Swiss-Prot record:
Subunit structure: Interacts with GNAI1 and GNAI3. Interacts with CD69; this interaction promotes S1PR1 degradation.
PANTHER family: G-PROTEIN COUPLED RECEPTOR (PTHR22750)
GO molecular function: G protein-coupled receptor binding; sphingolipid binding; sphingosine-1-phosphate receptor activity
Species name: Mus musculus
Residues holding sphing-4-enine 1-phosphate: R120, E121, F265, I266, A267, C268, W269
Protein name per the record: Sphingosine 1-phosphate receptor 1
Pfam families: 7tm_1
Major location category of this protein: membrane
SMART domains: 7TM_GPCR_Srsx
Length: 382
């Protein structure tokens, strides 16, 4: 019993000590052929890195304003907007993580311990994973809303927080797997070229997970569009011409929205997925395209910059609130603050009070789930 446990203890100590060994980074980068490429960066940050950092700064600023817009506007304190806020937070963190990644790259890489390297890369995985899982959570929430044809039920908030919590827990686990042991520190032949301390099986696993997420998002949005089309046909069958016409317009708007959402997501992420699959299949130093991974990664990060535009600024009410927040930041005076406290849309408070006192509040078009699904993805439910 003792004889079998001693080697295990030695192996554990060796594994733990490897996380603080600076030579491991050099050894793995040399094996994958990235050592000479990294040496070219000794003289400072490359121009492309500066451009990427500027893009990240824009992404960070953009998502900060989205969070401020949701926080400052009480009518956006609703379950659907919690998902938009969570998406903005994950996109903001993706911008921060990639900026830190760029600043700690190049010659600085060889000054990192494996543990620090895992934290540098793992933070990127966590932020980008949270962003993708947030997109899935938004699609799930919209699909459930369309099925129930209700926006205001008691379970919405708890379901929202449950989905948001699941996004972050799964993302943290996914990003933390390498530092917890799923790496190639003790197996050079299994190392990724793009990420030299990551095991190829882990890269394949992550690519598979993200591909399944993409397919799930595609299926959910197609189902949402199908539900809206079915409702439109029912109205036509009942010869309710005015409602059928409005529903058809919403269906068309929803179709455009779905195409934009899925096209942008695929355009940003598909190149990186393909690159990672090549990474799994190629032997070390055989695929030159793998040494250009930063261009594929920044494209995925760009998705964090397009999300606020697609999910926030295409909504008229959120766009007006967003512009008002930006205006307040540009002109921080008493008048601006006073203006912000007024209704975002003239007459909104008056019309809402009448609706609240009405015996049929559901007939307000703003409460129609179809409105939320069309016209810029998310419209106010009030």
């Amino acid at each position: 019993m003792v004889s079998t446990s001693i080697p295990e203890v030695k192996a554990l100590r060796s594994s733990v000590s490897d996380y603080g060994n600076y030579d491991i980074i050099v050894r793995h980068y040399n094996y994958t052929g990235k050592l000479n490429i990294g040496a070219e960066k000794d003289h400072g940050i490359k121009l492309t890195s500066v451009v990427f950092i500027l893009i990240c700064c824009f992404i960070i600023l953009e998502n900060i304003f989205v969070l401020l817009t949701i926080w400052k506007t009480k009518k956006f304190h609703r379950p659907m907007y919690y998902f938009i806020g969570n998406l903005a937070l994950s996109d903001l963190l993706a911008g921060v993580a990639y900026t830190a990644n760029l600043l700690l790259s190049g010659a600085t890489t060889y000054k990192l311990t494996p543990a620090q390297w895992f934290l540098r890369e793992g933070s990127m995985f966590v932020a980008l994973s949270a962003s993708v899982f947030s997109l899935l959570a938004i699609a799930i929430e919209r699909y459930i809303t369309m099925l129930k044809m209700k926006l205001h039920n008691g379970s919405n908030s708890s379901r929202s927080f449950l989905l948001i919590s699941a996004c972050w827990v799964i993302s943290l686990i996914l990003g933390g797997l390498p530092i917890m042991g799923w790496n190639c520190i003790s197996s050079l032949s299994s190392c990724s070229t793009v990420l030299p301390l990551y095991h190829k099986h882990y890269i394949l696993f992550c690519t598979t997970v993200f591909t399944l997420l993409l397919l799930s998002i595609v299926i959910l949005y197609c189902r949402i569009y199908s539900l809206v089309r079915t409702r439109s046909r029912r109205l036509t069958f009942r010869k309710n011409i005015s409602k059928a016409s409005r529903s058809s317009e919403k269906s068309l708007a929803l179709l455009k929205t779905v195409i934009i959402v899925l096209s942008v997501f695929i355009a940003c992420w598909a190149p990186l997925f393909i690159l990672l699959l090549l990474d799994v299949g190629c032997k070390a130093k055989t695929c030159d395209i793998l040494y250009k991974a930063e261009y594929f990664l920044v494209l995925a990060v760009l998705n964090s910059g397009t999300n606020p535009i697609i999910y926030t600024l295409t909504n008229k009410e959120m766009r007006r609130a967003f512009i008002r927040i930006v205006s307040c930041c540009k002109c921080p005076n008493g008048d601006s603050a006073g203006k912000f406290k007024r209704p975002i849309i003239p007459g909104m408070e008056f019309s809402r009070s009448k609706s609240d006192n009405s015996s049929h509040p559901q007939k307000d078009d703003g409460d129609n789930p179809e409105t939320i699904m069309s016209s810029g993805n998310v419209n106010s439910s009030s």
